[in-house]
Amino acid sequence: MHLRTRRLFAVVAMATAVGLTGALAPASTGTATAVPQQQTGAIRTTMANLDHLDWLSVEVTPPVQEGHTTYRIAEEPAIGTLWTYAEPNPDGSYRHVGGGTYDPETDTWGQGAFNADDMTRAAVVYLRHWQQTGDTASRDAAYQMLRGVTYLQTATGPNAGNVVLWMQPDGTLNPSAEPVELPDPSDSDASYWLARTIWALGEGLAAFADEDPAFAAFLRDRIELAVDAVDRQVLDRYGEHLDIDGEPAPAWLVADGGDASAEAVLGLAAYQQTGGSERAATVMHRLAEGIAELAAPAKDAATSWPFGAVRPWALSRSLWHGWGAQMPAALARAGVAAPAVRDSFTFDPWLLTSGGPDNGRLPSRIDRSQIAYGADSRLQSLLATAVARPATRTAATDLAGIVGSWYLGANPAGVRMYDPATGRTFDGINHDGTVNRNSGAESTIHGLLSMLALDGHPAVARRVTESTIAARVGSTSVEAETGALTGGATTVAPESLWTGESHYGGDGYVDVPAGGSVRVDLPRHHGGLVLPVVDQRPGAGRLVVTAANRKLGSVDAGEVGEQGDSPAPGLLAPLGGLDALPRDAGSVTLTARGGAVALDAVMVEPAVSRLVLDQDGHGTALLRTSRHDKTRTTVRVPGDGRATVTTYDGRGRRLSSSTTKARTVAVVVPAAGFATVRR
C-alpha cells in the first residue's frame, strides 16, 4: 500500500507563520523561458473564459520513453500539456513557471514544467466547455490534453495503469522529482494523479463516445488500465478497517483519502453513463462506500464536530480542508446521497458563516488561506446533491449563489478572485486577507469549472454578483493559553504544533492538572454553545464546564481508544454535549477532575451565526442556529425593496417562505437547519 502525501500539512506550521500555504504559491526559483502572456479584455456574455487556460496549454513532442505512449503517437507526435504555474510581470502580463528549482543550462525544473494533476483537470474543463457550448476548439484541446494525460500513464510493466506526475519542458518524464512527493517514483503506487486521471478519462470517454469512436475505444482501454491499478493496489484491502483512535476507518481509499477517491468516483460515474464495465462499477461503488464511512453521523450533526461534513482523510478524525473536498459530489453521483445532503445542508451553512472554504480546519480554524479549489469543491457538491435529491434544489441554489460569490468579492480579501475578461483566477487568499496574484493551472482550472457550472445553472448565476461581506458572525476559537490559569495549569509549547493528524492553535495547549482550571473570556454569543478542544488520551481526566455560576456539564478527555493506525497519539477534537451558555455569560471556566487534561482551545458557537453579503444594491443573508430549538433573531440586509425569507431543515428541504418590506428582517431560524434572506 501507498503512503499518503499531505502537502498542506507537511508545511502547515510554516504556512501559518508566513501566511501562505504550498497550495498558494509555486515552489520555484529562476525564470521561465516561455513568451509572456499579453492582457486581453473582450466583452463576454458568459462567465467562462478559457483564454488564460489556452495560454497555459502548450504542445510538446516527447522523446521515446519506455512504457509510455498515447493515441496515434506516430501520426501525431505532439501532445497537449499545461504549464503548472504563472507569475505576474510588472506590466500585468504573466509568465510560465514550472515546479521546483529552475536550471537554465538544461532548461529543466526540479519537479517539471507540466504535471498530471493539472493536465487531467484541464482536460475536464475543455470537455465540459465543449459539451456545454459546442466549441470545436475546446473539443480539439480536450483531445490533445487527453493524449498528453495518457502519455503520462504507464502502459506496461508492474506499474501499469499508474501515472507519472511530472514532465520537463522537452517532454522528458521525471518520475522522481525534487522536492519529493509520495509515492516515489510517482508511478509506483496509487495516487491523487491516478484518481484524477480516472476523472479525466471517464468524462473524456463519455464526451467522445459518439464523436470519435476510435479515440473513445482507446480511452476505454486506458480507463480500464487505471481501474485495474486501483483494484490491485487499493481495493486489495476492501472490507478491512484501520483503527483510528478507537474508531474504524476504511482501509481501501486512494491515498487513504476521501478527497482523492472522490475524484476517481467522478470519472467512474461518467464512465458508467456510457455503459462502463462491471469491474469499473464495482470499483466505483466500493470507493463510494469507503468515502461514505468518513461521513459525520446524523445524530447532533448541527452541534458537534465536524458539523455534518464528510472527512477528507481516513487517518484523522480531527481535520477538514476545503481543497479537493468533492466528497459530496462524488457520493451524490454514485447514488449515496444521504451523506452528501448532510454535508451540503448542515455543514456548508456552518462553514460559510464561520469563515468560508478554508484550507485547514484542524480542527480549529488554523489555516485560513482560501483557494479556488476549495470554493469550487463546495459549489460542485451543492449542484450535484441537488440533482441527486431534487427536493433540495432551492436550498442548493441559495447556498451555491453564496459560494459562487466568493469569486466576485464575497471572500476575506473583499476582491474579485476571477476575472471574466481574462479567464484568470488568482492563486489564493492568504490567512491575513492579502491576495496571491499568481494565476497557475489549478486555480485557473477550478475557477473555470465553477464558471462553467454557473453558466449551466442560470438560477444560481443570477445570485452570483459583485459582493462584499457586510457582516459575519460564526464559530470562533479562544486559545486556552490566553485564559487565566489556576491550580497548577501551565502552558505547553510543543516542538511542533502539527501533530501528524491535527494542529494545535496559538502557541500550544494548556496542561490542566486535576483540580486546575482555565477561565477564558467569550466573544458575544447570545446563549450559544462551547465545545472544548481537547487532546483526548486514554486515562485523561474530564473537564467540568461552568459559566455565570451555572454548570453546563462535563466532557471526558479520556473517552478515546488507543492510537492504533492513527499517525499520532491522542485525538485533538472539539467535544460537545454541554448545555447552552447563559446569555449573559462573559467567560467560561473549565476545571479538570479525575486526571490531567490537555486543553487547546474553546470553540464558541453563537446562538445564531450569520453571513451577510452586500451585493451592489441587493443583499443576501445566511443564518443558522446552534440551539436545539428554533431561534428568533433579526438581521439587517442591504438593498431596497422586499426581502424574501426562506427557511430549510438540515436536509435541504424548504420549510417556509415569506416576504417583508422591513429594513431589519425578523427571522425564525429552524433548529439544525438554516435560513436565507434575499433582497
Feature names for model-found ranges:
Residues 1-34:
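Secretory targeting and sorting signals
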Residues 662-679:
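C-terminal beta-strand-rich structural cap/linker in extracellular carbohydrate-active enzymes
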Residues 100-119, 176-194, 244-264, 303-334, ...:
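Solvent-exposed loop and edge beta-strand segments that line ligand/cofactor-binding
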Residues 522-539:
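A short beta-strand element within beta-rich, extracytoplasmic domains
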